[in-house]
Amino acid sequence: VSQAVLQACFLSKMRKIISLVLLLAFSQQPSLACDGTARQSSGDAREWWQSAQFYQIYPRSFMDSNGDGIGDLAGITSRLNYLKDLNVTAVWLSPIYTSPMADFGYDIADFFDIQPEYGTLNDFDNLVQEANKLGLKVILDFVPNHSSDENEWFKKSVRRERGYEDYYVWHDGYKNESGARVPPSNWLQAFRGSAWEWNEERQQYYLHQFAVKQPDLNYRTPAVVAQMKRVLTYWLDRGVAGFRVDAVPWCFEVLPDETGRYPDEPLSGYTDDPDDSSYLLHIYTQDLPETVDMVYQWRKLLDDYQRIHGGDRRVLLTEAWSPLDYVMKFYGNRTTEGAQMPFNFQFIVGGNSDKNNTDLPASGFVKIISSWLDNMPSGHTANWVMGNHDQRRVGSRYGEGRIDLMNMLQMFLPGVSITYMGEEIGMTDLDISWEDSRDPAACNSNANIYEQFTRDPARTPFQWSNTANAGFSTNSTTWLPINPNYVTVNVQTEEAASKSHLTIYNQLVALRKTKTLQQGDASYTAIGDNVLAIKRFLKDEKTYLLLANVLDSAVTADVSDVLRVSGNFNTIITNMLSTRKEGDIVSVNNVPLGAYEAIIVESQ
């Protein structure tokens, strides 16, 4: 629900505070120059995903092929050439399964079929086939924590049918002193309110850590574990190259005590709102050790499948808005492989806040980078997630002047890049009115506070052109309003421009293919408050520098000593705010940078 299900709306603000505390604890304190180095084992055989470009599509908002105002699979297929031109390696699709859409696909009624408004299984098979022809891989969202209450499994569990009695987490609850029925514990759901809901037919409460219509599956029941592994195998058989696992931390809860009672979670002290998820510390419902083991089991299933069926390695990407020490466990341990890519959300939870980092100094950027690279287990690959369908868009969170810089960072740093659709053209948030809101995280609140929780602003339809509805749909209306800035911020206009966010993104794509960026090491530093400097280097290959003024005041910097470089470099990529031209000479001991200017230069 995720990428994050999450978060702040549901991802409790509390979890982000914890992550930020850990981020600061793990990082160096700011100084004139905050340094870090990341080394890659270029001598080892590298797999396809280790320097891949992943591209997240929110299907409802990407491309509408049939004019109903909602994006669909055929629409995605029709735009595959655009993704190929972006040099995308793998396309990750947010949920497309059969769903009543209480949480836009994260409430799954049938894990083995396609939501009709998105298309059919034939449409999906065609998408995979056409993508593979272009050299693109398809990754699916895997939503293991819960199903829809309209799923047949839940209906059978309600009826206590044999084999399904404990598919979900059920409890009788209690009677208080006045005789009124009360839930089994004080646990809260991500979308506000109790995590327990009374079911009249079964005469018990069921656990739902997300919406009422999203009952939690019971992973302490072996049949559930086996069933969800069948789900993975089914889609592997249909040609998917891997899975992004949604809302991982919630899969297991503590067992009840010997009397059958679940423990109440302690108060967090972060808010006085008793319905807000961050009102409690979720020590009994999230981040349990059993969840890590479950991820290891899923990785083993993927590896076993690859050994039997051949082909490229299938990949596992996990979403966990958890403390860093817990997230790092998903990589694996000395004896067991875990996810290839536990998502790195440090550019989202780090900095000043998850909502506004427009004045983050260079030392803040270095801390964010270091927090992952310094704590990642050796022998593993980093990944960089700047945004997703649950977060404010990068340009709205870091500032429009930093759009190109954030794309530069994502492409320039060592490891895997993961782009949320629209970031390559600089799409920004659209404020959605209470009346137009569709996100349950917002709709479960009220008109006075919904903006604290809504994820709709980053989910507006993709902007293809300056024609009606941004070229997304022929319908007179779309499921969410389209950002009026589509007139200038769109693929067609930016492709035709001599310089745009998209042309810069494509330059970064080309640079990323160089051996230095594929295999080279990295060093990074902050010079004062303004300048972020990153070096990528590899023996016998060109050296590249990313030099960025992250603030709104001009500055001149000497990067020669801190990056251990000398002489002149040639300018090869500049952001929209730079007045430099390609080929301009840059002397590393005297680099003037305008407000928010970012450049990439190469050794002569």
Model-derived regions, located:
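Beta-strand-rich binding/interaction modules
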Residues: 554-578
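Loop/helix patches that line or flank the sugar-binding groove of alpha-linked glycan CAZymes
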Residues: 45, 49, 256, 260-284, ...
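Acidic/aromatic-lined carbohydrate-recognition and catalytic surfaces
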Residues: 25, 30-233, 237, 250-324, ...
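C-terminal beta-strand-rich structural cap/linker in extracellular carbohydrate-active enzymes
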Residues: 583-604
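Classical eukaryotic N-terminal signal peptides for Sec-dependent ER targeting/secretion
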Residues: 1-22
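Hydrophobic residues within beta-strands of alpha/beta enzymes
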Residues: 91, 243-245
